[in-house]
Amino acid sequence: GVTVVFEKEGFDTETSNGEMILSMICATAQEESLSISKNLKWGIRKRMQDGTYLNGMSPFGYEKQESQLIPIEREAEIVRYIYSSFLVGVGTVQIAEELNRRYPKENGTWYVSAVRRILMNEKYIGDVHHQKNFTPDDLPLLCQKNSGQLPQYYVQNHHKALVSRQEFEKVQTLLKRKGTELIFRVFLW
């Protein structure tokens, strides 16, 4: 096998003492890593409760400055267009097509899924919902929906809204209704 000599620490893995010391150092490092991780998560959850936490990416229509979401007016106009179009009966497919004509993206295409995400995102009424999803501590580290495994935090009026609460709630009702109609249509045909 391969022997590793740690000159600074004064041991090598060829001896049983060296292997034992290496095992102890590894176990200590693992515990230290877990402790740091728990402390970081505690700090993040505390900031979620206080309403001062913002996760990595800003939603379309906003930019992050320090711990604030600030509207980007050109993008905010597009968000308002999406909501107003949907509220007058334009479907998500047609909205995406019109966005691609009127407001082409620099880095790609407007898809129906992006339109739906904007229509369903509470950030556009100025609210933040933390821990809707989470990544568990154990392997595999795959993001999953939070179905009560961790506390969720909902902060109202966290930042400037791009659409009214009334518009948002009406859109949610319409989305649910359209989803139900689609399910029935699939079963009928």
Write out the residue ranges for each language-model feature.
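Conserved catalytic breakage-reunion loop centered on the nucleophilic residue
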Residues: 1-7, 11-22, 26-189
